Amino acid sequence: MKVSVGTVVGQGELGLEEGIVGNQIVSEDSAADVGECDAYGGRKKLVIRSRSRRRVVTPKALEVEKRPRRALRFKQNFCPEDAETSESSADVKGRARLLIDDLTEMGMHALRDFAVQRGISQEDVVVMKKSDIIFHVLKNHTENGGVIFASGSLEILPDGYGFLRSPQNSYLPGSDDIYVSPSQIRLFNLKTGDTIYGQIRSPKEGERFFAMLRVETVNFEEVAKVQDRVPFDSLTPLYPREKLNLETRTEDISTRVMNLFCPIGKGQRALIVAPPRTGKTILMQKIANAITQNHPEVYLIVLLIDERPEEVTDMERTVDAEVISSTFDEQATRHVQIAEIVLERAKRLVEHRKDVVILLDSITRLARAYNQTMPTSGKVLSGGVDSNALHKPKRFFGAARNVEEGGSLTIIATALIETGSRMDEVIFEEFKGTGNMEINLDRRLSDRRLFPAVSIKKSGTRKEELLLTEEEMQRIWVLRKVINPMDDAEIVELLIDKMRKTKNNEAFLRSMNTGAFSS
C-alpha cells in the first residue's frame, strides 16, 4: 500500500489489531518499528494513527508494512502521542538538565531562594505550597530551553492513565506529579508500583500536569527487560535461605541477640509483638541501620502508618532508607493508599529479581484503617472488627516471600498488644501464627530499663536451620537449655553482661560454656 503526501491512514487500513494503541510507523524500507518517530523527523514521511487523533509527522511518500503484533519491538522509548515534540538525544545533551528529585529534596527556604533566582517573583513564592513552587520552577526551566528528567512510582487510575508519585511526598497527589498516558502504559506493559525514570515535557495549552515524554528506565533497568518479567503472583515462594546479618557494633546488643535467637532471612515474614513503651521504634531503627550497613544490595522501605509526626522526622534523620509515612492526623483512606502503593512497588522490584525489605510500623494500625474504609459486610467480630476488613492486611503481610526465580520480599511488621483496646487484641490474634518469625517484647523488662526488652523464650524463627550453620545451631540449642530455667529478666541481664565482654557473636559462642554462664 502506497501513502501519498498528506494522506491520513486509518487503523483498519493498516491492518492493525485492536488494542495496539497510538502508533503504526510506515517507512520506505519497511524496517521501522514502533517508537522510531524521532529518528526519521524531517527526512521521511511517517503516518501515525492514534486513538485520540490522527496526524502526519514528516515529508515523503512511504511504503506501509503490515506487521503481526508479536513482532513489534520498542527501539525508542518515547510517547507516540508526543512524536512531533520528541527530540533526539543529541539535542538533549547540549541543553541544561534539571532533575525533579533535586527540587523535592530541598527545604522550603532553599527552594524559595532557588525559585527567585530562576525569575519567579518573591511575592508569589511566599504564598505558594512546595509542589506549586516546583511546578513553576519546572515550567520556567522549559520555557528557557532546558530539559527536565523525573522519577517516581507509577499509580494507574481506573480510567487507564497514571501519574508518577514522588516518594519524597509519601506518594501524595500534587501539582508536580507527572502524567503518564494510557498508550505508554500499554506500550511498555507498565503496572502500578513501577519505578519510572525519564524525560518529561511541560504542560501544553489546556493541560494541568507535566507529561512523560521519553521513558529511560523502569525499575532501574532497561525498558526492554519489562517485557520479560514474570508476574509476582506466579513466582514460587520458598523458605528464607540467605541470612540478613544484623550484627554491627559490639555495643548493639539488640541486633546481636536477634542474630542468634531469632535470625531474619531474605524473604522473612516477621512479626514484632510489642506492648506500648517497650522500645519497638528504636529496635526498628537498629534493624534498618544494620541492613543498610551490611546489605547495600537490599532496597529498604520504612512504612509508618498512623504514627506521630515527630517519630517520622526522627526516622528520616536516623535511617538511610526510603521513609514513607501517613501520620495519625491523616484519614484512613490515606493510610490504605500509601500501603498499597508501597506493596505494589515492592512487588515490581521483586519481579526484577531484587531483594526488598519493608519495615512496617504498625500492622495493627493498618488493619484499623482497612476496618474503617472497607464496606461493611454485616458480620462484626469482637472489638468491632468487620470480618472482611482483615483480608487486605493479611494479603499485605502474606506477600513476604523468598522467590525461587530470584529476588525476595521481606516484611518486618510490628503488632500492638496490651493497649487496652479489644480491637487490637483481635487483630493480633488474627495475625498470630501467620509469620515465620516472631519477636516478643516484654513490658516488665522495659519497666526495669532492660533493653532489648526481648522475651527470649517466646521469640524464634521457623526453619532457622536454613539460616544458621550447624555449629551455630548446636551452640544456640545448648544456650537455650542453660537459660530455660531462668526468669526473662535474668536472661536479658546475663546476655547483656556476657555479650559486652565479647567483640562479636562468633567470639561469644566460642567462649560459651555452662560454667561461664553459671558464674
Curated annotation (Swiss-Prot):
InterPro entries: AAA+_ATPase, ATPase_F1/V1/A1_a/bsu_nucl-bd, CSD, NA-bd_OB-fold, P-loop_NTPase, Rho-like_N, Rho_factor_ATP-bd, Rho_RNA-bd. One of its GO terms (biological process) is DNA-templated transcription termination. Its EC number is 3.6.4.-. ATP binds at residues 265-270, 277-282, 308. One of its GO terms (molecular function) is RNA binding. Residues 147-222 form the Rho RNA-BD domain. Keywords: ATP-binding, Helicase, Hydrolase, Nucleotide-binding, RNA-binding, Transcription, Transcription regulation, Transcription termination. It comes from the Bacteria. Facilitates transcription termination by a mechanism that involves Rho binding to the nascent RNA, activation of Rho's RNA-dependent ATPase activity, and release of the mRNA from the DNA template. Homohexamer. The homohexamer assembles into an open ring structure. Belongs to the Rho family. PANTHER family: TRANSCRIPTION TERMINATION FACTOR RHO. This is Transcription termination factor Rho. It comes from Treponema pallidum (strain Nichols).
